[in-house]
UniProtKB/Swiss-Prot annotation:
SUPFAM superfamilies: ClpS-like (SSF54736). One of its GO terms (biological process) is protein catabolic process. It holds the Pfam family ClpS. Involved in the modulation of the specificity of the ClpAP-mediated ATP-dependent protein degradation. This is ATP-dependent Clp protease adapter protein ClpS.
Length: 106
C-alpha cells in the first residue's frame, strides 16, 4: 500500500472552501400534525416505534399534538428526517389513519 498522503493536503483549498467543506449538515424538524380521526393510542405507537420515545414522553408529545395542533418529534439531518417522515406517513396509511408527518428546516 502506498504511503502517499497527498490527499491529506488541504493547503490548496481557500479558507472559505475549507469552511464550507467542514460545515455541519442542515438540520430538519420532524413534525406530527393533529387531525380529528387518528386515535391517540396510534400516535403514541408511532412516537415509540419511529422515534424511540418511552410511553411517558410519547404520551406528552401526543397531548401536545392534540392540544396545540402539532409537535416536533425530533431534529435530524435531511436524509434521516425525510426517511422518518416517509415511514410514518406510510405506516399511517397502511393502518387507515390520516395522520400527517412533515418536516421543516430547523
Amino acid at each position: 500500500m502506498s504511503k502517499d498522503k497527498s490527499w491529506l493536503d488541504f493547503d490548496h483549498l481557500a479558507e472559505d472552501d475549507l469552511r464550507e467543506a467542514l460545515k455541519p449538515p442542515s438540520m430538519y424538524k420532524v413534525i406530527l400534525m393533529n387531525d380529528d380521526y387518528t386515535p391517540m393510542e396510534f400516535v403514541i405507537d408511532v412516537l415509540q416505534k419511529f422515534f424511540s420515545y418511552d410511553v411517558e414522553r410519547a404520551t406528552q408529545l401526543m397531548l401536545t399534538v392534540h392540544y396545540q395542533g402539532k409537535a416536533i418529534c425530533g431534529v435530524f439531518t435531511a436524509e434521516v428526517a425525510e426517511t422518518k417522515v416517509a415511514l410514518v406517513n406510510k405506516y399511517a396509511r397502511e393502518n387507515d389513519h390520516p395522520l400527517l408527518c412533515t418536516l421543516e428546516k430547523a
